[in-house]
């Protein structure tokens, strides 16, 4: 797939407690802010929040499935708002630049919550596979 500015893809997912538990198991990130409601209630967040990287991992899924499967070269991320279990989030990646001298593409990456607020923003650089 030849990528050009304006090409984009999206993926939505409702985050479950099982997703959070499995992500914690796979990554060994057992921070109680994500897993222990009693602990998390005492924090500035007032309850458990989803691992930021769990939300960001949907960006990888979009790039790998909706944009022809280019190879990740880099990614910047800003975690703007917390994600809560039960929220439906949508990851979107949009081509904003294609280098003329090399096959390198820059993507704007955004994860939004179900009311359209940005929760994660950033940019990715990718190498198209063809």
Q: Where are the regions a protein language model picked out?
A:
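Short, surface-exposed, polar/charged, turn-prone segments marking secondary-structure boundaries
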Residues: 31, 37-42, 61-62, 77, ...
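Short, charged/polar low-complexity linear motifs in solvent-exposed/disordered segments
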Residues: 28-29, 40, 69, 74-75, ...
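Generic detection of short hydrophobic beta-strand segments and adjacent strand-loop junctions
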Residues: 11-15, 77, 124-126
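Mid-chain, well-packed structural core segment of small domains
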Residues: 65-91
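HotDog/MaoC-like acyl-thioester-processing domains
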Residues: 1-8, 83-130
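Hot-dog-fold acyl-thioester-processing enzymes
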Residues: 1-70
């Amino acid at each position: 797939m030849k990528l050009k500015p304006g090409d984009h893809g999206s993926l939505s997912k409702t985050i479950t407690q099982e997703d959070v538990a499995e992500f914690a198991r796979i990554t060994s990130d057992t921070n109680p802010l994500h897993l222990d409601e009693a602990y998390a209630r005492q924090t500035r967040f007032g309850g458990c929040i989803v691992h930021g990287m769990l939300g960001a991992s949907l960006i990888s899924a979009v790039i790998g499935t909706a944009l022809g499967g280019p190879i990740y070269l880099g990614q910047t991320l800003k975690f703007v708002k917390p994600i809560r279990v039960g929220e439906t989030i949508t990851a979107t990646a949009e081509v904003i630049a294609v280098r003329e001298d090399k096959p390198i593409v820059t993507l704007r990456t955004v994860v939004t919550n179900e009311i359209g607020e940005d929760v994660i923003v950033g940019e990715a650089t990718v190498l198209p596979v063809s």
